[in-house]
Amino acid sequence: LMVQLLLKSEKNSYEEHVAKNAASCARALAKHYGCDSKHYEAVCKYALAIFDKLKKLHGLNARRRLILELACILHESGSFINTHHKLLGTYDILKNTEFYGLTAEESLLIATTASTDEMHMIDITEPFENLSHKNSLVVTKLCTILCVANALDKSQNCKFDNISLKLKENELIVYAETDKNVHLEKWAFGECTT
């Protein structure tokens, strides 16, 4: 029993170490590719709050939460290659990137998740062809969360300081206050929630 408790403690410590260092590496990579840190930090904050609120519905674990976090940080990296085809550029950059403590399969999950947005979530089929059925379902869930989070900062001006979330039956209600114009965010939010 003592060995199991120690092993569990060590595993949790190791997972925290991996998550911290993988996120640090992703931020360094995002800086290299000229990603806007205020934007990706806002998207991260929103996405992780949504992930945590929907945990009972999506059933994904902490490792999948880390994949979502890294995808949020790096979702704009493809603009470095081509601003007109940034999603494909993001996929190409990330699919072969080695992330600290993660497997090649997990890098592919990050690449596929990061290379979607509210307008192209369904259109990108090639990345999904490289995934198992189980991982396709995981990525679909993560993409949906990322799209909603990205829509909340579509203008990349961090218009919402905080959001609050309420789960009512199977519906997620997002509350956000601001005195700024949020027409673009409302439009993008509508695109990814219909």
PLM regions: where:
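Generic alpha-helical secondary structure
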Residues: 40, 142-145, 185-192
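Long, charged amphipathic helices and adjacent flexible linkers at domain junctions
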Residues: 9-32
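Divalent metal-dependent catalytic cores for phosphoryl transfer on phosphate-bearing substrates
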Residues: 26-30, 39, 45-165
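Cytosolic transmitter module of two-component histidine kinases
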Residues: 35-37
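Low-complexity, glycine/alanine/valine/leucine- and proline-rich hydrophobic stretches
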Residues: 155-194
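Oxyanion-binding/catalytic loops of NTP- or PPi-dependent enzymes
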Residues: 1-16, 45-48
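Core structural elements
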Residues: 2-10, 70-76, 165-172
